[in-house]
C-alpha cells in the first residue's frame, strides 16, 4: 500500500461517510473534496448540490467557490438559489449537509464568523454563507476539519451554525429538524455524538494515531467510546482518485498540487 498523508486519511474517511444515492448539500473546500472523492469512488450516484444552484454537479476539478463555472457546466440542471433553500433544503430533500468549520465545540456547533470579541475581533472569519440553514435543515450533517486546540475549543466565541446546541435534546427544543451533526471527521480520528448527551466522543482512531494525540489536540476533556475502532487505511483506488482530482485541480487553477 502507498504511503499517505494525514490529510488524505481525513478526506478518504469523510468520503466514505457519504452513502451512494444520497442528496448532499456541499460546502466549498474540504467538504467539496471529500464529497467529490465519494462520487468518484464509493458513491457514484450521489447527487451533489451547491448553494449557487447546481443540482447533480460532477466537476472534473474542485471549485474555487460556489460561483465556479465548473459546477454549472457539469450539473444535471441549475436552479435559482431561492429554490435550493426553499424547495430542496427547507423542503426536507437534503439527506446530508457537508460542512467545514473554523472552530467546533463538543456538541458540534460551528464557528465561521469571528475569533475573539465580535466587536473587536482578533480574526474576522469568512462568515456564514448558507451553513446555518444547512446545519439547521439537512436530515443529517457531516463536519470535516483539521484537529487542534485552536479548532476544537471548549467554548465558541460565536455560534454560526447550530449543531446540538447545549447538548441533550436542545436541538429539538429549538425546533430544528433532522439529526444534526452525526460525525466529525478530522486528520486524527472520527467522532460521533454520544446517545443521550449528544456530546461528541471518539469512535475511531486513524492508523498510527494515539489517544494522547487526540487529547492534546482537543480543547475540552474529550472522551472515547467503550469500543474505539481503527479507521481503515486508504485503498490504492481511493488514493489514486484523490491524487488525480487534486492534480487536475492544481493544473486548472495554476496551483501547486495536493494538500490543503
Swiss-Prot record:
What keywords are annotated for this sequence in UniProt? Aromatic hydrocarbons catabolism, Transferase
Which pathway does it operate in? Aromatic compound metabolism; beta-ketoadipate pathway; acetyl-CoA and succinyl-CoA from 3-oxoadipate: step 1/2
The terms under GO molecular function for this entry are:
3-oxoadipate CoA-transferase activity
Keyword Nuclease included in the entry's annotation: no
The EC number on file is 2.8.3.6
- Enzyme active site: 51
Reactions that this protein is recorded to catalyse: 3-oxoadipate + succinyl-CoA = 3-oxoadipyl-CoA + succinate
Which superkingdom heads the taxonomic lineage of this protein's source? Bacteria
Q: How does it assemble?
A: Heterotetramer composed of 2 A and 2 B subunits.
This one is known as: 3-oxoadipate CoA-transferase subunit B
Protein species of origin: Pseudomonas knackmussii (strain DSM 6978 / CCUG 54928 / LMG 23759 / B13)
The gene it comes from is catJ
Amino acid at each position: 500500500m502507498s504511503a499517505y498523508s494525514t490529510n488524505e486519511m481525513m478526506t478518504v474517511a469523510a468520503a466514505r461517510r457519504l452513502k451512494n444515492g444520497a442528496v448532499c448539500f456541499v460546502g466549498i473546500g474540504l467538504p467539496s473534496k471529500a464529497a467529490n472523492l465519494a462520487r468518484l469512488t464509493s458513491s457514484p450516484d450521489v447527487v451533489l448540490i451547491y448553494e449557487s444552484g447546481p443540482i447533480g454537479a460532477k466537476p472534473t476539478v474542485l471549485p474555487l467557490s460556489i460561483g465556479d463555472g465548473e459546477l454549472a457546466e457539469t450539473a444535471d440542471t441549475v436552479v435559482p438559489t431561492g429554490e435550493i433553500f426553499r424547495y430542496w433544503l427547507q423542503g426536507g430533500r437534503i439527506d446530508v449537509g457537508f460542512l467545514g468549520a473554523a472552530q467546533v465545540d463538543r456538541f458540534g456547533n460551528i464557528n465561521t464568523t469571528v475569533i475573539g470579541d465580535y466587536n473587536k475581533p482578533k480574526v474576522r472569519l469568512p462568515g456564514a454563507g448558507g451553513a446555518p440553514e444547512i446545519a439547521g435543515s439537512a436530515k443529517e450533517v457531516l463536519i470535516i476539519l483539521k484537529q487542534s486546540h485552536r479548532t476544537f475549543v471548549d467554548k465558541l466565541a460565536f455560534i454560526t451554525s447550530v449543531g446540538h446546541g447545549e447538548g441533550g435534546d436542545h436541538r429539538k427544543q429549538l425546533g430544528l429538524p433532522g439529526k444534526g451533526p452525526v460525525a466529525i471527521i478530522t486528520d486524527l480520528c472520527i467522532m460521533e455524538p454520544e446517545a443521550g448527551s449528544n456530546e461528541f466522543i471518539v469512535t475511531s482512531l486513524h492508523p498510527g494515531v494515539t489517544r494522547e494525540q487526540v487529547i492534546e489536540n482537543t480543547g475540552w476533556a474529550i472522551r472515547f467510546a467503550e469500543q474505539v475502532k481503527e479507521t481503515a487505511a486508504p485503498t490504492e483506488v481511493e488514493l489514486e482518485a484523490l491524487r488525480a482530482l487534486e492534480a487536475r485541480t492544481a493544473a486548472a487553477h495554476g496551483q501547486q498540487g495536493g494538500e490543503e
